[in-house]
Curated annotation (Swiss-Prot):
Superkingdom of the source species: Bacteria
Family statement drawn from the similarity comment of this UniProt entry: Belongs to the class I-like SAM-binding methyltransferase superfamily. RNA M5U methyltransferase family.
SUPFAM superfamilies according to UniProt: Nucleic acid-binding proteins (SSF50249), S-adenosyl-L-methionine-dependent methyltransferases (SSF53335)
Annotated residues for binding of S-adenosyl-L-methionine: Q289, Y318, E339, D387
Keywords for the protein's UniProt record, in alphabetical order: 4Fe-4S, Iron, Iron-sulfur, Metal-binding, Methyltransferase, S-adenosyl-L-methionine, Transferase
Domain TRAM span(s) in chain numbering: 5-65
Lineage, broadest ranks: Bacteria, Bacillati, Bacillota, Bacilli, Bacillales
EC annotation from Swiss-Prot or TrEMBL: 2.1.1.-
Protein name: Uncharacterized RNA methyltransferase BH0687
Cystine connections: none
Length: 458
């Protein structure tokens, strides 16, 4: 179908019924079989939409007026929901979000993975799905001569200046407000991305939800931080719980937030938090799950699926700072963790020592290279756990798992599409998907975490 053949043109107004939702939360309507994607519309709704873009085979629209609203529609409580790109689903009731996430996982398992024998469990949600994030990464800029800090507008690098975010912990909001106020007062310039000038690029606040400890990270374009001494004193005075104030220097013209150089300006290099009974040291650049309450739910589910009795050897691929490894070590005979990022492995070893685990061993490298080496050394894994990034497992890693033939594979996923793709590879290699459990780690967003378990067929 060419653009000329599309049954709609740009700026047309059409009356449609929303049939479904996409993976990024947009409503799907059909006009003579032509798909129209309409953000912030819900299944079952009848509405008038303006066509804003026409492409080959599909187009985009925006809601003009609602004719019949869904019973799942709610008033978004956040005043900047329609501008900010942080949340996508505040117009949808929380129960409906949980059903949507379960359906998304079920649909992609069937469509991409051709896995039809498994019924995905209902999504495990939060009792209090607000204020859950323990980390805020806030871009800083300038507008009309004044410093601003907030979050990016959806699909742009335009900063929405804000003092509060309803999914951030209140302590993080307080840090951002105080630093923004102090920087304005002291005349510290925000970063101009286009011209690559100004001082303060980002403010990062990290909060240990179970310890109350706070870290403030100031990411600057250069080494120089004007009024550094005064700024540190004032931050410490304004935020009594602060345990660490850190500067990270990022001189590059890049979208990457952190630079290579990090130095402690005041206090400790680490703050601490706990998930369950396990304590974790968190540095400025450590990867640590942003919703510790649901992380425990996710890891407890992974443990249940691993079905450990105390006699098993477990490999944790993509182990990060050792969060899942240490959970597994509570019930396994021995755990081997592998991760490509050297700093993460340093943190993992530190966390193992911190908690007194002697049955964990960590290695730096590509899992698909390290695991065959372990196998050659006589390591036989009963269970392999994978927790890959959004792109899913490396093809070579999946081959390695199939060669090692563990009894069970536990797959922790942050992307249902790559989960489905990888489960298909494992099923074709002799495994059977037994169970899939979505966990809502990021309420009010379209992000979906889930954990699946596969067992080796006879």
């Amino acid at each position: 179908m060419s653009k000329q053949q599309a049954p709609v043109n740009k700026n047309d107004v059409v009356e449609v019924t929303i049939e479904d939702l996409t993976h990024d939360g947009a409503g799907v309507a059909k006009v003579d079989g032509y798909a129209l994607f309409i953000p912030k519309a819900l299944p079952g709704e009848r509405l008038k939409a303006k066509v804003v873009k026409v492409k080959k085979g599909y187009g985009f629209g925006r809601v003009l007026n609602m004719i019949e609203a869904s019973p799942d529609r709610v008033e978004a409580p956040c005043p900047v929901f329609n501008q900010c790109g942080g949340c996508q689903l505040q117009h949808m009731s929380y129960d409906a979000q949980l059903r949507y996430k379960q359906k998304q996982v079920q649909d992609v398992l069937e469509r991409i993975g051709k896995i039809t024998a498994v019924t995905v469990r209902p999504t495990i949600g939060m009792n209090e799905p607000w204020r859950y994030r323990n980390k805020a990464q806030v871009p800083v800029g300038e507008r009309e001569g004044g410093l601003i800090a907030g979050f990016y507008q959806e699909r742009s690098h335009r900063i929405i200046d804000m003092d509060e975010c309803m999914i951030q912990h209140e302590e993080n909001d307080k840090v951002i407000r105080q630093v923004k106020e102090l920087a304005r007062e002291l005349g510290i310039r925000g970063y101009d991305e286009e011209k690559h000038r100004g001082t303060l690029r980002h403010v990062v606040a990290r909060y240990g939800k179970n310890t109350g400890e706070i870290m403030v990270v100031l990411i600057t374009r250069g080494e120089e931080l004007p009024h550094k001494k005064t700024l540190i004193e004032r931050i410490h005075k304004a935020i009594p719980h602060v345990k660490s104030i850190v500067q990270n220097v990022n001189p590059k013209r890049t979208n990457v937030i952190f630079g290579d150089k990090t130095k402690v300006l005041w206090g400790e290099e680490y703050i601490y938090d706990t998930i369950g009974d396990i304590k974790f040291a968190i540095s400025a650049r450590s990867f640590y799950q942003v919703n510790p309450e649901q992380t425990k739910v996710l890891y407890d589910q992974a443990l249940e699926f691993a079905n450990l009795t105390g006699s098993e050897t477990v490999i944790d691929a993509y182990c990060g700072i050792g969060t899942i490894s240490l959970f597994l070590a509570q019930q396994a005979k021995h755990v081997y963790g592998v991760e490509i990022v050297p700093e993460a492995i340093s943190d993992a070893k530190r966390n193992a020592r911190l908690n007194g685990f002697a049955n964990v061993q960590f290695a730096v490298g590509d899992a698909e290279k390290v695991m065959p080496w372990w196998y050659a050394q006589g390591v036989r894994a009963d269970v392999i756990v994978v927790d890959p990034p959004r792109k899913g497992c490396d093809e070579a890693l999946l081959k390695t798992i199939l060669n090692m033939k563990p009894d069970r594979v536990v797959y922790v996923s942050c992307n249902p599409a790559t989960l489905a793709r990888d489960l298909r590879v494992l099923e074709d290699g002799g495994y059977e998907t037994k169970d899939v459990q979505p966990v809502d780690m990021f309420p009010w967003t379209t992000h979906i975490e889930s954990v699946a378990v596969l067992e080796l067929k006879n």
